[in-house]
Amino acid sequence: MRSSASRLSSFSSRDSLWNRMPDQISVSEFIAETTEDYNSPTTSSFTTRLHNCRNTVTLLEEALDQDRTALQKVKKSVKAIYNSGQDHVQNEENYAQVLDKFGSNFLSRDNPDLGTAFVKFSTLTKELSTLLKNLLQGLSHNVIFTLDSLLKGDLKGVKGDLKKPFDKAWKDYETKFTKIEKEKREHAKQHGMIRTEITGAEIAEEMEKERRLFQLQMCEYLIKVNEIKTKKGVDLLQNLIKYYHAQCNFFQDGLKTADKLKQYIEKLAADLYNIKQTQDEEKKQLTALRDLIKSSLQLDQKESRRDSQSRQGGYSMHQLQGNKEYGSEKKGYLLKKSDGIRKVWQRRKCSVKNGILTISHATSNRQPAKLNLLTCQVKPNAEDKKSFDLISHNRTYHFQAEDEQDYVAWISVLTNSKEEALTMAFRGEQSAGESSLEELTKAIIEDVQRLPGNDVCCDCGSAEPTWLSTNLGILTCIECSGIHREMGVHISRIQSLELDKLGTSELLLAKNVGNNSFNDIMEANLPSPSPKPTPSSDMTVRKEYITAKYVDHRFSRKTCSSSSAKLNELLEAIKSRDLLALIQVYAEGVELMEPLLEPGQELGETALHLAVRTADQTSLHLVDFLVQNCGNLDKQTALGNTALHYCSMYSKPECLKLLLRSKPTVDVVNQAGETALDIAKRLKATQCEDLLSQAKSGKFNPHVHVEYEWNLRQEEMDESDDDLDDKPSPIKKERSPRPQSFCHSSSISPQDKLSLPGFSTPRDKQRLSYGAFTNQIFVSTSTDSPTSPIAEAPPLPPRNATKGPPGPPSTLPLSTQTSSGSSTLSKKRSPPPPPGHKRTLSDPPSPLPHGPPNKGAVPWGNDVGPSSSSKTTNKFEGLSQQSSTGSAKTALGPRVLPKLPQKVALRKTETSHHLSLDKANVPPEIFQKSSQLTELPQKPPPGDLPPKPTELAPKPPIGDLPPKPGELPPKPQLGDLPPKPQLADLPPKPQVKDLPPKPQLGELLAKPQTGDASPKAQPPLELTPKSHPADLSPNVPKQASEDTNDLTPTLPETPVPLPRKINTGKSKVRRVKTIYDCQADNDDELTFMEGEVIVVTGEEDQEWWIGHIEGQPERKGVFPVSFVHILSD
């Protein structure tokens, strides 16, 4: 007991708290005091040491709590050592395994010395790894287990749990002592005495029970403390001694293991020195040979020139340089500081691509802002490491990234994208070629993704797979693609459709196979229940299935019973150019490079030789499949010719590209002693010679483009009439002078536009003129019955009611017909954009005026004469609007635009690209021919009237059409006309002031839908000098001209804005009523709903007016004229 007291005393003396509390009791003193009290309670002084006992327990509790915290940290560290050691052991085992495999490769390549060395090092690593595993096991048993037992046993809990029974005994003692003391004092007071204190001897007998309980709990507490001290001290150190011995054994055994290789290592070092000398000598000779060849071919000058160009391409001019690892494209979110008074940070979706930064708005209906990085400068913020500024030509954008790493990524991507765009600009014409290749590759990928089954993973069915197996032509998800990579490139070669820059050669199989077709073969015999994984399956299930499917071909359809039958099927697949049949025999395990027994061919010719010999631009996918899956590209025929020799012999450069992509041996010679390059030079196959030279010098680019009949779909062009009818919202006219091309539509992909022969640049588009239209770019005839009006266009101004005849039977009226010739009512729609409209990304697809398919002859060229003009109607579909004006006005309902299927119009452009689109090149006779049109009869028999409640007036000649502003020079026959065009058959040249006042619209809005003729038939108005010039508005001639379009189908059917008129005289308040909903795209535009009234305050141009909502002057801005109609004053 004395030794226990001394241990406790030494343990406690190191604690500062103990040193600050001198009134404590040691274990030996407690034992002596308690024994004395037990033998003689009345003479004992134990009661005076009660407070010392309590102080001692408090001090011990503090020390135990500190030890508990320290031991928990020790345990955490030891566990970290154990876990990292286990990882280290696993990594060492993996290292030994791959090193052994690597050494085996050397052994198989007749290089035994190096192979044996690698295998021995692999064995050494395995043995050391085993020793380390034993050491970690000792650490777990001796240290971790001991600490776990102590912390989860005696030291379990929190501070104070251990001394709770002691505290209760102390409290009971205090309570009883206070009670007795009070009674003694009361008793003395009753006898007239005053008690100052009560000694322990007086109450020893009365307090004996409580004192014994206190002494018992004190003993229990000290016993537990003693046990804990033993476990955390002696026991733990004994286990650390055991771990020490384990460490000694580990190092001694490891040294013995390493000593076994000592002599071999010394011998190996000498051998390696000799091998290195041999290799250095070879390298020296090769270098000398290379320098000799380079000097003879004068390649030094070319390389220096190329280097200078590349240095120029990396133009910096003190610009910020980004980390190239981040690339030049990125999507994500940035915080952008607003420009308002509050300057708040707003989270915005941003993307960088092709030198353009796109910043989305908070609302999806607003078009994102696009900044050309070539005109911007990226400037990091010195004060905030996560912020940077983007300085454009007209404002500064303040951005903040989520963290510093994201900040570095955005800065690098912005800088790299700008540098890439600058490099592309410096490269000039070369960039256009690369851009067209990128467009083609993008179009092929889009076509691949549309193939049946390619919307889900080929193996597990996950949606939207983006990983391509280039040698199988299938799409997989990212999880399954990882297993494909593990199987090796001889089974499946995985590339990303989004992350990798693919060449068209890598898309040949993907374009021709597809997941459904592939699985019809490879999964034809799936058992039930199906082992095929699902998108939620784990990697083990996926790996088992994919290995069985692609390595073992376990689920494929079996059609051949013998090897000869398989070879026959292989031959037939090549001869019939059936890729799926080729995949079928591949799935059955045919040896693709076995010689084929085909009479009339070179002896020993394989399927690859035959495919190369018979290849053209439609069968490259067969060659590609054989090249990527045969395994031996150097197989020779009886005459020693490889597939490379065949490419040179038969001049097959596209096949050669596919072969060189898989890196065959290019210097194989045939029986004549010629390589493929020699044959190409002898036969002067220049392309093959260049490709083989590049491969021989190591400069061949595997991501190569091949010439192939891709047969890309152009579904975007086949837009039906019904599709267009479902788009009731009109198209706003963009305020820009750039005209719209007849073949441009937002639904046409860039590659489709490039493939159109009639595709022209924006500069060419601006040269479109009316003279080009007379060349009959788009012509359609119809003999269908007359049609009834359909409210598609915005309502037009009323005309005086006179009944007019329908058009000639051979013409197609300017109204929408169904395919059967019957008419239906449709939603009203605004006209297509005017010539000044600039297409933006926010615009919906152009509603090209559609009509029924051609049913008659389609004349082409310039052979327009009076006879054909009177009976065959020229229609110019998909072109910008034109106006035909006249002073004779007849009351018409809403003008109905004819509809021609977009695919018809666009296909006709293929034969119209040779026609002149320049007004200057069109002779005046064209206009004169077009103007010789027969006059329509004024009154038909009642039975011939169509249900259309429209009235016709004499047709104006085409020569009187107004010129398109800024495009057409004045013609000789139009030069002496006033700014406002007039009809040729009216009295000579009435002036602008002679026009009647603005027509009233409201009274005729509903008439076209009723099918009734106007109740008041009036003759056409004559021009009178009664109207004041101030009554005119730019809308009047435009709408009047739109009315006349229904009269003459030979006229271009879409109106052109007239030259801007300057209003003179007193200003008058104009009010218009909206007939469509309009959502503003720009800050200065006006948003309104159908039926609201706008007060016009000004004009920005002919197609855009300025105004505010009536009664709400704060809602103001510009609005398109085609979205409103004018109210009467």
Swiss-Prot record:
- Where Phosphoserine occurs, the residues are S720, S729, S842, S846, S1014, S1033, S1041, S1128
One GO molecular function term of this record is:
GTPase activator activity
- Residue ranges under compositional bias (Pro residues)? 938-972
Q: Bias regions of kind Low complexity — which residues? A: 812-825
Q: Where is the composition biased (Acidic residues)?
A: 716-725
Domain named SH3 is located at 1067-1129
CDD domains xrefs: ArfGap_ASAP1 (cd08848), BAR_ASAP1 (cd07641), PH_ASAP (cd13251), SH3_ASAP1 (cd11965)
In the record for this protein, the ANK repeats are positioned at 603-635, 639-668
Per UniProt, residues of the Arf-GAP domain are: 442-565
Q: Which residues carry this modification: Phosphothreonine?
A: T1048
Keyword check for Zinc, yes or no: yes
**Which chain segments does UniProt annotate as zinc-finger regions (C4-type)?**
457-480
Which spans does this entry mark as compositional bias, Basic and acidic residues? 300-309, 726-737, 907-917
Segments of this protein annotated with the region Disordered: 300-321, 714-763, 780-1063
Q: Any domain commentary?
A: The PH domain most probably contributes to the phosphoinositide-dependent regulation of ADP ribosylation factors.
Q: What does this protein do?
A: Possesses phosphatidylinositol 4,5-bisphosphate-dependent GTPase-activating protein activity for ARF1 (ADP ribosylation factor 1) and ARF5 and a lesser activity towards ARF6. May coordinate membrane trafficking with cell growth or actin cytoskeleton remodeling by binding to both SRC and PIP2. May function as a signal transduction protein involved in the differentiation of fibroblasts into adipocytes and possibly other cell types.
Q: What is this protein called?
A: Arf-GAP with SH3 domain, ANK repeat and PH domain-containing protein 1
Organism whose genome encodes this protein: Bos taurus (Bovine)
Gene of this entry: ASAP1
